[in-house]
Amino acid sequence: MTKFIFVTGGVVSSLGKGITAASLGRLLKDRGLKVTIQKFDPYLNVDPGTMSPYQHGEVFVTDDGAETDLDLGHYERFIDINLNKYSNVTAGKVYSHVLKKERRGDYLGGTVQVIPHITNEIKERLLLAGESTNADVVITEIGGTTGDIESLPFLEAIRQIRSDLGRENVMYVHCTLLPYIKAAGEMKTKPTQHSVKELRGLGIQPDLIVVRTEYEMTQDLKDKIALFCDIKKESVIECRDADSLYEIPLQLSKQNMDDIVIQRLQLNAKYETQLDEWKHLLNTVNNLDGKITIGLVGKYVSLQDAYLSVVESLKHAGYPFKKDVVVKWIDSSEVNDDNVEAYLSDVDGILVPGGFGFRASEGKIAAIRYARENNIPFFGICLGMQLATVEFARHVLGYEGAHSAELDPSTPYPIIDLLPEQKDIEDLGGTLRLGLYPCHIKEGTLAEKIYNKNDIEERHRHRYEFNNEFREQLESNGMVFSGTSPDGRLVEIIEIPKNDFFIACQFHPEFLSRPNRPQPIFKSFVEAALNYQQK
C-alpha cells in the first residue's frame, strides 16, 4: 500500500519545507523506494499559469502539460523524477471542481460545505498522486504556515486521511524555526512549541520535527523540543543553514531521517543509504575553479525566481567544466541599440529566456543583434527564439517593422503568428501548447551535434509559432531550421551556422535539467561561453 508523508511549516514562511520534502524524497529514492511528491497551494488561482511572474516566480511545466508551482522544479531536480498534473493542487482547482460538480447536480441538491465536500476533493487528489505513479511513498508539502486561514481545509483533509488509511500508513513532518536571540546569546524553542501546539489543536500530532537553525543545536535543546512537543528525541532533526542546497540531504541522512521514516511507515527499503553520487556532486559544487558570466536579458529580472529553472540549468551546465556560472541580470526594458554594448561587452555568453507581452521586447532584440553581429555565444528560449527570427528578418533580410503578431498585431511581416485553429480562442487560460512534445532534428546541424540523436522530447509553454510563410526567405539568407515537429510543420530549433554558437529553441529545455545530468543545449552553451572566454 502507498504510504503518505505530509510536510507542514510553522513559525514563519520560507523555511525550506520544499527543500526538506525534496531531500527526504531523494533519500528514500536512493534506498530503492518509488517516490512521488506533491504540493498543496492554498491560493484561489486555478493554477499559476496566468499569475504575474513578479507575484509567483516561474511557472514550472510538467510532462503532461500542467502549469505548476516552481517548487516542483526543486522536487524534480533533487529526486530526479518526472512529476504529473496531480503533483500540484491549488485551492482554486479544488473549489472550481467542487462547484462544477454542484452545477451538474452531482450532490443531488445537498448543501455543499468545506467539510466534507472540499476535504473529500483534496483527499481524492492526494490519492490520485499515488495511484497515477504507483508510488511506494507520496510526500505532500502543505503550502503556507500553520494557522493560516487559507490552509485549514488542507490541514483538515490530511488529519482525516490518517483515520481513512490507518496510522501506520501516514506520517507528519513539521518544519519550524529556532531563532537565535543575539542579546540573550541563545536559541529559543518557544516558537516551535507554540507552532506544534497550533498544529495539535487542529488534530495533527507531528511524528518528526525538522528545525531550521543558524547554529548547531545542543542535545539539551533537542531534548526540550522532544519533551514539550511529545515526540522521540531522535525525531528532532536539525537543518542548519547551508552554503549549498545540495548539503541538505546529507545533513538529514547523518541524523538518520530516512531510517526513522522507513521504520515508522514499515517501508521495505531495498538498499542501505547510498549517497556517493550526491557526495560527488557536492564535492564538485564546493570545488569550482573560475567562473563564466552569462548575460541573462529578460523583463522580470527584479524577481530572479521568475527564471529559477534557467539559472539552475546554467549552474548544472558549469559543473562538468568545474566552473561557476554567474548570471549578470540585465533588464531588457533598459537596453537599446545605443547602449547594448555597455551592458553586454563583459559577458561570455548571452541568453534571452521566455516571456510574454510587448514590453521590453525591443531590448531583447537589441541584445540578440549584438550577439549575432559580434559572434558571442547566444542561446534563446521560447520568446528568445521567436525574437531571434524577428531580429534576423529585420536586420539581415531588411524587413522593416517585422515582429511577432503577439507583440505587434499590425506588423507588415508577422514572422511569429498564431496557428489558424487558435485564432478564435479568447481566454488566456488553457490555450497554450503545453507539456512534452517530440522534435525531429535535421542531420548535420549544431542541434544534432548537441543532442547526438535526431529525435528528442522537450517541454513546451507557448501560444504563438514561427510563421512558415517566411521560412524559405530566412533559410536562403543563412538561418537553419534544425528542429521541427515530426510532421515538419512547427519550428522547434533555429541556428546560424555562420556564428560559432547561435542557437534558439521554441521549447523550454530548462525543465529537464538535473544537477548530475545537465541539459544538452545548456551544457553546450556554457562550453561555448568558456571557449569564447579563453579566446
From Swiss-Prot:
Chain positions recorded as CTP binding sites: 13, 148-150, 188-193, 224
Gene Ontology annotations of biological process type: 'de novo' CTP biosynthetic process; pyrimidine nucleobase biosynthetic process
Binding site for L-glutamine: 54, 355, 383-386, 406, 463
UniProt activity-regulation remark: Allosterically activated by GTP, when glutamine is the substrate; GTP has no effect on the reaction when ammonia is the substrate. The allosteric effector GTP functions by stabilizing the protein conformation that binds the tetrahedral intermediate(s) formed during glutamine hydrolysis. Inhibited by the product CTP, via allosteric rather than competitive inhibition.
Gene3D superfamilies linked to this entry: 3.40.50.880, P-loop containing nucleotide triphosphate hydrolases
Amino-acid positions noted as binding Mg(2+) in the UniProt annotation, renumbered to this chain: 71, 141
GO molecular function, one term: ATP binding
Region spans: Amidoligase domain: 1-267
All copies of domain Glutamine amidotransferase type-1, residue ranges: 293-535
Catalytic activity, reaction form: UTP + L-glutamine + ATP + H2O = CTP + L-glutamate + ADP + phosphate + 2 H(+); L-glutamine + H2O = L-glutamate + NH4(+); UTP + NH4(+) + ATP = CTP + ADP + phosphate + 2 H(+)
Alphabetized UniProt keyword annotations: ATP-binding, Glutamine amidotransferase, Ligase, Magnesium, Metal-binding, Nucleotide-binding, Pyrimidine biosynthesis
Binding site for ATP: 14-19, 71, 240-242
Any one Gene Ontology cellular component term annotated for this protein: cytosol
Role of this protein: Catalyzes the ATP-dependent amination of UTP to CTP with either L-glutamine or ammonia as the source of nitrogen. Regulates intracellular CTP levels through interactions with the four ribonucleotide triphosphates.
Further comment: CTPSs have evolved a hybrid strategy for distinguishing between UTP and CTP. The overlapping regions of the product feedback inhibitory and substrate sites recognize a common feature in both compounds, the triphosphate moiety. To differentiate isosteric substrate and product pyrimidine rings, an additional pocket far from the expected kinase/ligase catalytic site, specifically recognizes the cytosine and ribose portions of the product inhibitor.
NCBIfam families referenced in this protein's UniProt entry, alphabetically: PRK05380.1, PyrG
Full protein name: CTP synthase
Native organism: Staphylococcus epidermidis (strain ATCC 35984 / DSM 28319 / BCRC 17069 / CCUG 31568 / BM 3577 / RP62A)
Name of the encoding gene: pyrG
